[in-house]
Amino acid sequence: MLNTTQKSLLVFMGVFFLIFGVDQAIKHAILEGFHYESLVIDIVLVFNKGVAFSLLSFLEGGLKYLQILLILGLFIFLMRQKELFKSHAIEFGMVFGAGVSNVLDRFVHGGVVDYVYYHYGFDFAIFNFADVMIDVGVGVLLLRQFFFKQKQNKIKGIITLFK
């Protein structure tokens, strides 16, 4: 029988490989020449040498090693914060799966494979599925952490009133 930490690790790994696999499959299609143009969104191939909005692109090849250190450091931290990891295994799986996929791009292609270009009314940075999964994972984690804790504290307060 698996304990809760082992179950959380399995959930984390499942989400990790799902996000990683979907992202790499989409990027493969883009690299093979898939493109799309419309009035709102274009699918175009761009190699991003930096991070969000091409920041830190001046680090060039060193950026991928910095990102590996950050990913490993965060993973080690989470393995020591078992309650945080167990309660947010899905979100962390999303963030890590997407992050590792983007780092792999840096090693294989020299930059992150970006392709979604939103340009209706204004030009937005070109991004990819992994970027969206990182944003969604962090957003859900913050919402759950903030609202769940507030709700839990209110319930504890109400329970202590009736004791």
Curated annotation (Swiss-Prot):
GO terms for biological process: proteolysis. Pathway: Protein modification; lipoprotein biosynthesis (signal peptide cleavage). The keyword Disulfide bond does not apply. It comes from the Bacteria. Its main location: membrane. It catalyses: Release of signal peptides from bacterial membrane prolipoproteins. Hydrolyzes -Xaa-Yaa-Zaa-|-(S,diacylglyceryl)Cys-, in which Xaa is hydrophobic (preferably Leu), and Yaa (Ala or Ser) and Zaa (Gly or Ala) have small, neutral side chains. One of its GO terms (molecular function) is aspartic-type endopeptidase activity. This is Lipoprotein signal peptidase. The gene is lspA.
